[in-house]
Regions:
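Glycine/threonine-rich ATP-lid/beta-loop region of ATP-binding domains
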Residues: 546-549, 553
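Hydrophobic alpha/beta core scaffold segments
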Residues: 561-565
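N-terminal localization/anchoring segments of enzymes in phospholipid and broader phosphate metabolism
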Residues: 1-536, 554-558, 570-592, 598-659
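Cofactor-pocket helix-loop regions in the catalytic cores of large enzyme subunits
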Residues: 541
Length: 659
């Protein structure tokens, strides 16, 4: 990690935004989409769900990390000069503000949903017929699967999994008048929302939590139910990686099991919960009052999209159909002829991701193809890409898959798919123990006459067919042999630790990506000093690295105009006189998740023009991407592709007024 030193004459917090607080600002922007009435109603509900899911994952990783730093006595300050304790305190306050907004959004959406005859009912609002139906549902569907547990010396407190929801009850035995607490963990196999009426005109729902509370006396017939508490927990879910583990797969299998029992870092309860029960449960999880988060009306907001069942087109975004790729149509879907003709780029999801799948399927079937090398960071369990690689191996081709088992929350799935590929005859490589292989690359080796020609697919996003429908990403297809030779070296580096002596086209983390960015920014500074056009356009998910931010500030002070599109975390403070007055930052949040990483440099000419330098990458500008991951930066040299990226993506992005 670069330890950039900032001006000692200025407060460090005025030069950098704290990473954790910036992330919370990002999630606030996601939450704002749930309030935006220009979005269809069900899409607003979905944004509320996404904001809740995002916050859970933030606590599972980032907030858990702060807890661990405090516990371990870690005294190093963050890049913006805060201790772990300072950061945690600020995160707590900001999160509670965010949850107030979430509560407001939920109540507003309930009103909007009711106008569409979609209701989330309280038990007190129901008639006898509804209650009879729910009692039957409870007896037939809920009761057989739940495990009510009395809490006393002979019944230990049950394990509640990460993101688990439960109900704590305080009861009094009718005969002995003895007070007793009991807990019911809500099974994940059951839906959060139970439908009362699913006609074409009216949808009514109640939560499973409320149903269990209503009929709890049927679980404990000899008791009076005095009070109940609905709650949800979030556990520390980070896996500490051992670089020297003898067997990486076995290590991760053990670590995944251990992660399931991580410490509780967030306790979510309904507002106005019973104080006695709240005190009891907070002691059980060793949570002080600051880390108890109150929500109104619904524990587990991420489940709210379950109610979006009504089939009414106006409630959702208009169906989106991606375009077919024109270049392939020109060549009658003959992939290798189309790619050999000249490079082309595909902009997902506006153009279909099927082209990537079809590329690998064509390679699997083509008798001239002798080998395929492929990175896999995230994909689906039934991925057509995995099927194509398996088929290729079964057809006698030499197939190598670099599967990243350190991909957070996909570790288990990736171990499983690697075993599936291995059974089909694919050679599996897990890459470096200390670096995640985050680059997106596919290399196809094809026998053409007396020579072997290489074809490559390089992307900014994962080989994930489902995410590709909602993530904006770029795919480059090329048979440029200089570029292909670099990709061959990339694979040899990952599979055999063969560090390349020279790369002709690409740049790689952790080898030279940091130097690449610093040199490109420095070149713009030099051009500005010579009176030449000096400008940078960049699009990424996150901008965190202090060294790169410092270089951007230096460029701004030299007169370089910098336009940044940063979807998520941004630690740079734009528009500050004498520091960043020439830097503009925007963040696009909308129907599609902005995921592509694009870096453009004026190179002495006004933007946009052919003389500008354009690169696409798998890397964001974060210390981990530059120093602790395997990433690729790819130059765009084909004139048509170069123009498409500058004009149709970057210029359009900066002109887009929605933020």
């Amino acid at each position: 990690m670069s330890k950039a030193s900032f001006s000692e004459n200025a407060n460090i917090s005025n030069q950098l935004i704290n990473r954790e607080l910036s992330w919370l600002q990002f999630n606030d922007r996601v939450l704002e989409e749930s309030k935006d009435k220009t979005n269809p109603l069900f899409e607003r509900v979905k944004f509320l769900s996404i904001a809740g899911t995002n916050l859970d994952e933030f606590f599972m990783v980032r907030v858990a990390g702060l807890f661990n730093q405090i516990k371990d006595g870690f005294d190093e300050l963050s890049a913006d000069g805060l201790t772990a304790e300072d950061q945690l305190n600020r995160v707590v306050l900001k999160t509670k503000d965010l949850l107030k907004k979430q509560n407001e959004a939920f109540l507003e959406l309930k009103k909007e949903l009711s106008k569409e005859k979609i209701f989330i009912r309280k038990m007190s609002e129901l008639n006898k017929k509804d209650l009879m139906y729910l009692r039957e549902y409870f007896q037939e569907t809920i009761y057989p699967i739940i495990t009510p547990t009395a809490i006393d010396p002979s019944h230990p407190f049950p394990f509640i999994p990460n993101k688990g929801q439960a109900i704590l009850l305080r009861m009094t035995r009718i005969k002995k008048k003895r007070e007793l607490n009991a807990i019911i963990v809500i099974p994940r196999a059951l839906p959060k929302f139970i439908s009362l009426n699913n006609s074409e005109t009216i949808n009514e729902f109640v939560t499973i939590d409320d149903v269990i509370c209503k009929f709890a006396n049927e679980i404990f017939p000899d008791h009076n139910i005095e009070a109940s508490l609905q709650f949800k927990i979030i556990r520390d879910s980070e896996i500490e990686i051992d670089d020297e583990a003898a067997d990486l797969v076995r290590y991760f299998e053990k670590a995944i099991k251990k992660r399931r029992r991580g410490n509780v870092v967030k306790l979510e309860v309904l507002t106005n919960s019973n104080k006695k029960l709240l005190n009891f449960i907070s002691k059980k999880f060793k949570m002080d009052e600051d880390h108890i988060y109150e929500v109104e009306g619904l524990v587990g907001i991420q489940d709210i999209d379950e109610i979006c069942k009504k089939k009414d087109p106006k409630l959702r975004f208009k169906k989106f159909n991606p375009r077919e790729v024109e270049r392939l149509k020109e060549f009658d879907n003959k992939f290798f002829s189309a790619i050999r003709s000249k490079d082309f780029v595909v902009h997902h999801p506006f153009e279909t991701f099927d082209v990537v799948i079809q590329f690998l399927e064509a390679a699997a079937k083509d008798p001239k193809v002798i080998g395929i090398k492929q990175t896999l960071y995230r994909t689906t369990p039934d991925s057509p890409i995995v099927k194509a690689l398996s088929r290729a191996a079964e057809n006698g081709k030499v197939v190598t898959a670099v599967v990243e088992i350190k991909a957070r929350f996909d570790e288990e799935a990736n171990i499983e798919l690697s075993r599936k590929l291995e059974k089909a005859g694919v050679q599996i490589v897990y890459g470096f123990a200390k670096y995640k292989t985050h680059a997106k690359a596919s290399l196809v080796l094809r026998k053409e006459g007396a020579k072997t020609r290489s074809y490559v697919h390089l992307g900014t996003g994962n080989y994930h067919p489902i995410n590709a429908k909602i993530y904006t990403d770029l795919s480059l297809f090329s048979s440029n042999q200089d570029l292909a030779k670099d990709v061959e070296k990339f694979f040899n580096y990952v599979t055999g630790y063969a560090k390349p002596k020279k790369l002709n086209k690409i740049f790689m983390s952790p080898l030279n990506s940091r130097n690449f960015f610093e040199e490109k920014i420095e070149n713009e500074i030099v051009n500005a000093s010579k009176g030449k056009p000096a400008e940078i356009w960049a699009k990424m998910n996150s901008l965190v690295d202090p060294g790169i931010i410092k270089k951007f500030y230096e460029a701004s002070n030299a007169g370089v105009k910098i336009n940044l599109s940063v979807r998520g975390v941004c630690c740079l403070r734009p528009g500050i006189k004498g520091q960043s007055e020439n830097i503009k930052v925007k963040s696009l949040i909308g129907r599609f998740l902005e995921h592509s990483r694009i870096y453009c440099f004026a190179n002495g000419s006004s933007m946009p023009s052919r003389e500008n330098q354009v690169y696409i990458s798998s890397a964001d500008l974060m210390p981990r991407n530059l120093d602790r991951r395997i990433e690729i930066i790819i130059p765009i040299e084909n004139n048509t592709v170069h123009e498409q990226i500058l004009d149709q993506i970057m210029l359009a992005n900066f002109k887009d007024k929605s933020e």
